[in-house]
Amino acid sequence: MHSPQLNGDKKPSRWKRLWYMGTTWLIHTRLAFHLALLAMILTLPALWLGWQLDDHLHRTVMMGLSPFKSGHLKIFSAFTFFNGDSETIRRLMDLGVLPWWTSPHFRIEFFRYLSSLTMWLDYRLWPDWPSLMHLHSLLWYAGLVAAATCFYRQIMGPAWVAGLAALLYAVDDAHALPAAWLANRNALLAAFFGILCLTAYDGWRRLGKKWCALAHTACLALALLSGELALAVAGYLLAYTLFLDQSRLSRRFLALLPAALVLLAWAILYWSFDFGTKGSGFYINPLISPVEFIRALVHRGPFLLLGQWSPLPAELGTIISGKWILIFFPVLLAFLVFLLFPLIRLDKIARFWLLGMTLSLVPIAGVVPGNRLLLFVGLGAMGLLAQLLSGLIEKPGKFPGRPSWRIPALTLGIFLMLFHLILSPLCLPGVVYSLKPLGEFFASPVKTVSDDPKISRQDLIVVNPPDYLFSINLIGALKILEGKPIARSIRALSGGPVPLEIQRLDQCSLRVKIHGGLFQGVTGRLYRSQEEPLTLGQEIHLRGLSARVTRMDQDYGPEEVVYRFPVPLEDASLRWLKWEKGTYVPFIPPPIGKSVRFSGIDPFDFFQRQGPS
């Protein structure tokens, strides 16, 4: 599997020369540096992204401007949002930081102290320079690629196939968001220290380096302090124990004890200080909702694998209904078994990659699927793909020779090679930069919200926002960051991109019909899980507003809600807005007995926004 030599007796063809040059580069001693540099170059558009989406919310926290005080030191508070205290949740619902349908036990607090520390340093050193914050993230991504390259070479040897795996990992467009989005930097840190842990563990168990026994536990602790994504390391350690460790079985599992103790200590701290999530359908806590978590794993796992292996993004899992899983999952499983079984049967390293990749799906199954979660899944997938391609090219005799396997396998192999080695690196800069128009789609309309000082004595009501997390929360966050007046509360009559019908019942009341249900869209279930449903007839009272559920959809929650205000809807204390063609414009409530309809948010508004730039 080393780089092949050119035949000195005959002049080699152009393709053979290119092949020789490529494989020679893939065994270069400085390949880790080369690939780290390549990864930075492909993700350089991140330097011009600025702050986007969650970044604005993190800015309010790190600058001490957030209306929510987590109780943690600012240095560690970037990922500790809502603590589940019912009084605090009610106060934030009154302000509009949380919508009226929020679970009273809503909690999102992540034990990401190391990642938070890196963000705190950004705001201490260059608070007004987002480009330097992005450069900081890109350096972490470069370090991650270098660490992955060293790990592939240590596990697979100095052959060109290890270099190919590292190249596939470095240019994977699934890594765009972790590299480009400041709020997702925690994934880079978790993967960086996690891969260092695996490298050190192999150095201890196979190479006999005693200092690595301590190093792998230290790296595991740092990975866990960076983000929950690092739990995937446990899956790879188990896979290593089963397939790569050559000692007696009892010694293999005994060697896992130091890492197990680190995981146990982390878990005790995590649960003792109430980290984690509760009441949210966007994040599913496996300890609180085990059945829902297993259901999510079955639904989301295939889409996560789809996002890793194919050009289709894992985000498809947010828009395709569960019934399609009954068809899609067996087909995907059959494809992987068909393609990889001969390799898995013959090669223990391939078995290590496969099991590590599969087990790394578990920690991310509790989150809405997305390519940004695939840093550990990709580690095993790219190792497998490199071995598959090298076997098809160099040692076809190791695989079945019958046309019924070889022709489809070669076809799929060529497709995967073209996608991952050509299309993916070409797309990576564009996927990185796509975060900017996505962020501006939600942030730019905030400029159309009035800066009149009177608004500080008014309640702002948005009747049809595209969603709540970014549309409504960014109004308050951006106004606070810009030092401009902000409404005393912000309300939304719906929380997703769905058609509405609003009927005026009397001077103070509206009936809102939400076609399909309130909890639609990517973030529809963020604030309330299916295990804690709203009920028919339930009424929630906030300061200046009550909401009563008058019709329900079994899957997507309230289909009809009656809103009642303590004053007539035309009162000067209320300021009404509607979302129209990518911007906010004034809305006049209809006369009593009359209705007004809104179509769902046009997805092309994202590309053809007519609001201010």
Show where each model-derived region lies.
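Polytopic membrane enzymes that build or remodel cell-surface glycoconjugates and lipids
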Residues: 2-478, 545
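Intrinsically disordered, polar/acidic, low-complexity terminal segments
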Residues: 56-60, 321-328, 345, 400-613
